[in-house]
Amino acid sequence: MNILQFNVRLAEGGAAGVALDLHQRALQKGLQSRFVYGYGKGGKKSVSHDNYPQVLKQTPRLTSIANIALFRLFNRDLFGNLNNLYRTVTHTRGPVVLHFHVLHSYWLNLEEVVAFCGKVKAHKPDTRFVWTLHDHWSVTGRCAFTDGCEGWKDNCQKCPTLSNYPPVKVDRAHQLVEGKRQLFRDMLSLGCTFISPSQHVADAFNSLYGAGRCQIINNGIDVATEEILAELTPVAITTGKPKIAVVAHDLRYDGKTNQQLVRDMMALGDKIELHTFGKFSPFEGANVVNHGFETDKRKLMSALNGMNALVFSSRVDNYPLILCEALSIGVPVIATHSDAAREVLEKSGGKTFSENEVLPLVQLSKADIAQAVFGTDLESFRNRSRKAYSGQQMLEEYVSFYQNL
């Protein structure tokens, strides 16, 4: 079996983490696998490019720069195609699986992608298409993260905010939504199978494109994290005041980090110690430790291991890997209500909370937080979580899925 994983970025973001992990696990299993990505920072080759085998940067820098510049006006990526891979795919001996992940974010023109798939299928009928939906982009006119907006159910009549990612200056979502959805119907006609790690994304997709069109395979922790877990000694009792972690790529973004909730935790003063991990922290105080954005996962996991809990308040994530990772190392997660957090936590017997319930919880010991969130002791919660978010299980589900296509 020959598998090509496609994602806009190689090693940045949750979708990249899933795609890259599937790629690495497939290679370990002796399968033929390649990872095709759009671009790295600034449109250049990813800084992680040389760290992984069988990876290919696919898009010229000028294409991504042009898409970034024009997207704000046109609400779609005007340029970018996969035509330079046509011969590679069609000349491959044996069945080929093209597994798409995130294709938006200034990488590819969707119409060009569908046309490419049609040509490949006509030339090489044993090609199969799989598309993992990591966000809501397949149902909206423009954005990937709806942040609570349900305008897509009414064909994106008027965007309530132009700032939902990817942001724009002019709202053209209503003009684009039907044409975009037709392209997804065209992919279904080509036999593309859609998967999502999260039930609520699958439900949204199925409500538009037909019952059962999108199936569920939950995300799992990656190979690197599993290696780190094997070496980490779980910290059951932390010394001093409760240590609470907040993790986000950009800590300023309220959609990912509820700014008021963090400030309310800061107002607890010396009752807690707040640790942030991410860029551009706007939080400064006597009880705040800003670690910055930690690119070394080993260091991040080691730091989280010493925390009483991770507080998660994102409204825009769909099946956040950081939750799977924290839970797998035995760090309780105190999450505010959202479909994503509820879905992840329920898998290990946990629950979510309202904002006003968070403040009393963060003042508890690690064991008491585990009891409050998961209804069990710390060790039982840790063992349950380790099994629930297994990356090996994710691979086995996908490989079984590929083989049954």
Regions found by a protein language model. Name each.
Residues 312, 332-335, 342:
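Short hydrophobic beta-strand element within catalytic cores of glycosyltransferases
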Residues 278-301, 309:
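Nucleotide-activated donor-binding/catalytic signature segment of Leloir-type glycosyltransferases, i.e.
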Residues 200, 220:
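Carbohydrate-associated surface elements
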Residues 237-279:
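Conserved catalytic-core segment of nucleotide-activated headgroup transferases in glycan assembly
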Residues 315:
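Aromatic "clamp/platform" in nucleotide-sugar-dependent glycosyltransferases that forms part
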Residues 232, 359-367, 373-404:
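A charged, aromatic-enriched C-terminal amphipathic alpha-helix characteristic of glycosyltransferases
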Residues 301, 323-328, 339-343:
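Short alpha-helical segment that forms part of, or immediately flanks, the ligand-binding pocket
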